[in-house]
Amino acid sequence: VYKRQLADYRGKVIFLNFWATWCGPCREELSRVQKDIIDRFKGNEDFVFLPVSRGETRETVAAFREKMGYTFPMGLDPEQKIYRLYASNYIPRNFLIGKDGKVISATIGYEAPEFDELILLIERQLNSAN
């Protein structure tokens, strides 16, 4: 469970991702996250990736993370309280939030070209002077 709020990350580019272990498109998307997001932006203190598992237990998420070999932390939202602040249906659900705290992009589902565009948006935000 994340113990911080989005406001704690003001001034940073935030990639907020809602997912679940049973969701095929979520799993496909997460398979790209390590290489295309975590490794690519590693060490950039202006970037934060917040993956939030929707409706699952700590044990389920921990077992999935270990099985897949992911090194990034995964937040928990077992009762979907956080998710309901952003959406009512469908995962994966992604929000790219700019340094000013405003949503730049919101996507539903996983499609490779859309994910590629998200990576470019992250790069542009990190390279901007704001």
For the regions a language model picked out, list residue spans one by one.
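Short active-site neighborhood of thiol/selenol oxidoreductases, capturing the structured segment around
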Residues: 6-27
